[in-house]
């Protein structure tokens, strides 16, 4: 039997990019599991992110939907990354789990 390989790493949607008074919902801040420094986070630049959720209405035989995004750059000194999604993630996803795909590979 073939050996299974990891296709993604788990992460959490922390917040939008923001200043003291202005929030920017175009840019989401993501904390990746096991990443604690900007040096480690650089590996994930350009990787695809999927927010997978279950919707009440079935479309084309499935209630599962996905919002896709991409890691654009690091954020701060704790290993957070900034990500842009095709459609902005709604605020109810703060704290929700996202999948950071291990492709496209840059090694």
Curated annotation (Swiss-Prot):
A GO biological process of this protein is: cytoplasmic translation
Keywords on this record?
Answer: Cytoplasm, Ribonucleoprotein, Ribosomal protein
GO cellular component terms, alphabetically, are: cytosolic large ribosomal subunit
The membrane-spanning stretches of this chain are: none
Q: Which PROSITE patterns match?
A: RIBOSOMAL_L35AE
Q: Where does the UniProt annotation locate this protein?
A: Cytoplasm
Entry GO MF terms: structural constituent of ribosome
Task: Say what the protein does.
Answer: Component of the ribosome, a large ribonucleoprotein complex responsible for the synthesis of proteins in the cell. The small ribosomal subunit (SSU) binds messenger RNAs (mRNAs) and translates the encoded message by selecting cognate aminoacyl-transfer RNA (tRNA) molecules. The large subunit (LSU) contains the ribosomal catalytic site termed the peptidyl transferase center (PTC), which catalyzes the formation of peptide bonds, thereby polymerizing the amino acids delivered by tRNAs into a polypeptide chain.
- Annotated family: Belongs to the eukaryotic ribosomal protein eL33 family.
Subunit info here reads: Component of the large ribosomal subunit. Mature ribosomes consist of a small (40S) and a large (60S) subunit. The 40S subunit contains about 32 different proteins and 1 molecule of RNA (18S). The 60S subunit contains 45 different proteins and 3 molecules of RNA (25S, 5.8S and 5S).
Q: What is this protein called?
A: Large ribosomal subunit protein eL33
User: What is the originating organism of this protein?
Assistant: Candida albicans (strain SC5314 / ATCC MYA-2876)
């Amino acid at each position: 039997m073939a050996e299974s390989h990891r296709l993604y790493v788990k992460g959490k949607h922390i917040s939008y990019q923001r200043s003291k008074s202005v929030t920017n919902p175009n840019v989401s801040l993501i904390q990746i599991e096991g990443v604690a420094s900007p040096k480690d986070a650089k590996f994930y630049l350009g990787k695809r992110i999927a927010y997978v959720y279950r919707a009440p209405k079935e479309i084309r035989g499935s209630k599962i939907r996905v919002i896709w995004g991409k890691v654009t750059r690091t954020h701060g000194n704790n290993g957070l990354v900034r990500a842009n999604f095709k459609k902005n993630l709604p605020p109810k996803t703060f704290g929700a789990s996202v999948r950071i795909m291990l492709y496209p590979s840059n090694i």
